[in-house]
């Protein structure tokens, strides 16, 4: 029993250590890179997929990735994203094609870590000229854990870019979280050439060109924001495919789509008012609410209306404090009469009925009411007829769906009137000017969303019908009453108007904004020192900052709710000289290098060790190793799977080798060695995750048989996360999705050679499918089962083994001869054909 206990303890400890190495929080890895030298001397390379674990780099400001090749540092750097992915930064020309916003980024901070002050420097930083700070010691209160989670999830930050205007940022030294601990805040200026924050924390005006490209949100930021209370949170997941950067992919929810469709149908039933033709003083006020469709009338035959002559005004501040109901009523009543080319508001309705318009009597029983739907509902049955004139009058066609529909427009005065004056005030308050949809994003940015940017990404009715899933897009912005909301806040507001004909109370809207709207706040030096400011403070700070830039003045900086200052901090900033905006370069993310950049790496023929490292202040240097292989365009490549092909099974092939058990097929090492001696290159392609790169490479180097090991070659793994790769391979059983994309990309590197792949080894029909997709013939596709039986796909009835295939390796894998050869030019003069005895003549007619 002691032996059994010791064995169980050993197995448990080994599995525990293995899990620690595979934990996504510490999982790092790099996929090998293949560089192919072309016939003209240029180079092509496969993507650089490098990923650092979440705990490998705690602080996102230290995002410069250094590269060493063969032990020597190179003048090439990568940038680290918030989810741990590394990528190159390329500057675009002005005349180059447009780049998707998610691929845009800020330049690499060349200053490195030397540009950041240390902890001692933060506390004793000298005061810059022109900056006067007055204030007393502040008392720091202990933050609650729940408050910390909200700060980590909802806080947003701003990146300081080099330009004509430089901003001064207050730095605060972290202090112990004791009730009596007190520290004095000292100022420090931010170097202009340092970009300490991640891409997801950049404002679009700071890191992009003058074209209205929105700021690309990093992956971890999108993951954190998906943790907010939202019905779509469970549908979000990271998707990282071969040759591309990671992105958030969301699955569509059928039940939610049905709700949206029903809401759209109800919105389609809203009436449209004809253009006024008389003075508004001739009639009273209508109190028409959205009508209700009768079950006998098809809602899809009507379209929501848009008013072509509606007035568009720029939004000063999307987070401005909302006006009270009394203020709204006074403003609407005190407004002057609008011109005839503009639509009438609730307080200035028209009374003239167009000629030929059917009038509905206000007599008893003329209108069908429902006590649950409010006093202003009307059925389509109340209309005398639904001819083309009435349909065009009440339901005109429009280009945009619920985007430009005016909910507050009353119908004709004589069509529906309310005898109760209380309803007038109610409808005046419970009205929405218009609702518009746009994919412009920018709700978390400190700057307001411009009207041009909002209009540029406007969502039309056709866009919504073709892709209802765009409502799940994190960049969706809903404009209601000249205010911007995300869908999580706008959906309850729209539903309340449609179902109850009433607006949500201001307290409810404010609560929704605090819970589900991305907050706008300042970015402090440390990732755990992020502040959240209320909307009122944001608005006042932006107004003061704009005034400060035009003319120098003393600005009062408000602190957050966790710091209670005895006196305000006063900043005296000198006026900045006005400068004309010049050309701002645009940078994009890339995973590949150009031919000139590859030439500067001075790669050796064959394998080149590469180390990607990120240096942090508290954790030291986090390294990730990989290999760059330099091949020629005319090399012949043999593809080999790992799990189930080199190992005896898929699942146990991951576990048993870590326990010291040899779980490889007999004879495969010697077979691969003989094939390699004939001049063939080996490429190992597996659907394992990128975090298992070191584990997989160590296993392939450990495999040995009769003193010879497996040939060296690039190990191409899936760049997705560990659990995504296991789900795709074990649950979905679709590893060919990755392999087809990967092998097709490798095949493009060998152009103009039509087929660089000579043979392939696998263990599943999925592997055979992937190999066929890249043009391999069935005669050179081999599959092996767990019993070690090797099957050639062309002759499936014949079974062999790796040992037997090694005996005839010269026939299936003849030696590769480079350059001109008489054997290849004239096969009849080869050693085999020229010296062999001629075949005997057989008279088939005599045999018949």
Curated annotation (Swiss-Prot):
Disulphides: none
Skewed-composition ranges (Basic residues): 135-146
Location of the motif Nuclear localization signal: 135-144
Keyword Oxidoreductase appears in the UniProt entry: no
Tissue: Significant expression in intestine and other regions of the gastrointestinal tract.
Function per UniProt: Magnesium-dependent phosphatidate phosphatase enzyme which catalyzes the conversion of phosphatidic acid to diacylglycerol during triglyceride, phosphatidylcholine and phosphatidylethanolamine biosynthesis therefore regulates fatty acid metabolism.
Compositional bias (Low complexity): 165-191, 271-282
Region (C-LIP): 587-789
Motif segment (DXDXT motif): 641-645
rRNA-binding among keywords: no
A Gene Ontology BP annotation from the UniProt entry: fatty acid metabolic process
Entry GO terms, CC: nucleus
SUPFAM superfamilies: HAD-like (SSF56784)
Compositional bias per record (Polar residues), positions renumbered to this chain: 342-358
Native source organism of the sequence: Mus musculus
Name of protein: Phosphatidate phosphatase LPIN3
Gene designation: Lpin3
Cofactor: Mg(2+)
Motif (LXXIL motif): 652-656
Modes of activity regulation: Inhibited by N-ethylmaleimide.
Composition bias type Acidic residues, residue spans: 151-164
Ranges annotated as biased composition (Basic and acidic residues): 536-556
